[in-house]
Amino acid sequence: MGRFIFVSFGLLVVFVSLSGTGADCPSGWSSYEGHCYKLFNQQSQWAHAEKFCTLQHTGGHLVSFHSTEEADFVVKLAFQNFGHGIFWMGLSNVWNQCSWQWSNAAKLKYEAWAEIYCVYFKSTNNKWRSRACRMEAYFVCEFQA
C-alpha cells in the first residue's frame, strides 16, 4: 500500500511538472517561451489586424519578435499551416516615433509622407519586408501567457 501511494505521488509530481513547461494557451493557440500565438486565415489591413488582435485576448497584439528562435518558431508555424503567404507583424512606423532631423540640424516641423509602412514576414523565411499598411495580408496575434 505504501509503495502504491509513493508511486502515485511520484506520477502526480511528474505530471504537474510537465504541465507547467508550456504556456497555458487557449485552445487553437500555439505556445512558445511563455507566449501564445495564433495565425488567422483572413487578410486585413495592418490597423484592422492590430485591433482584431487586441480583441482576441487581454494584452494581445500583432506578433513581435525578440529572438531568432521565436521568429523561426512563428515562421515555421505559418508555413506548416498556410504554405506560402505574407503575414503582418506588430512593427510599423504608424506612430511616427522616429526622431527625424534635417541635415542642417533644424527640427522637423512640416511632414508630407506619401505612405505609412508596416512590416511583414513571408512564411518561407524570417526576413522582414515593408509595404503600405493599407494593403492586406494574413496576420499573427500574440499575447503573454
UniProtKB/Swiss-Prot annotation:
Gene3D superfamilies, per the entry: Mannose-Binding Protein A, subunit A
Residues annotated for Ca(2+) binding in this entry: S64, E70, E142
Signal sequence region: 1-23
Protein's cellular compartments: Secreted
Keywords (A to Z) from UniProt: Blood coagulation cascade inhibiting toxin, Disulfide bond, Hemostasis impairing toxin, Metal-binding, Secreted, Signal, Toxin
Classification via Pfam families: Lectin_C
Disulphide bridges: C25-C36, C53-C141, C118-C133
Superkingdom of origin: Eukaryota
Gene Ontology MF terms: metal ion binding; toxin activity
Domain C-type lectin: 32-142
Cross-referenced InterPro entries: C-type_lectin-like (IPR001304), C-type_lectin-like/link_sf (IPR016186), C-type_lectin/snaclec_domain (IPR050111), C-type_lectin_CS (IPR018378), CTDL_fold (IPR016187)
Gene Ontology CC annotation, any one: extracellular region
Tissue expression pattern: Expressed by the venom gland.
Job description of the protein: Inhibits thrombin-induced fibrinogen clotting and factor Xa-induced prothrombin activation. Binds to thrombin and prothrombin exosites.
Quaternary context: Heterodimer of subunits A and B; disulfide-linked.
Family, per entry: Belongs to the snaclec family.
Protein name listed in UniProt: Snaclec salmorin subunit B
Organism, as annotated: Gloydius brevicauda
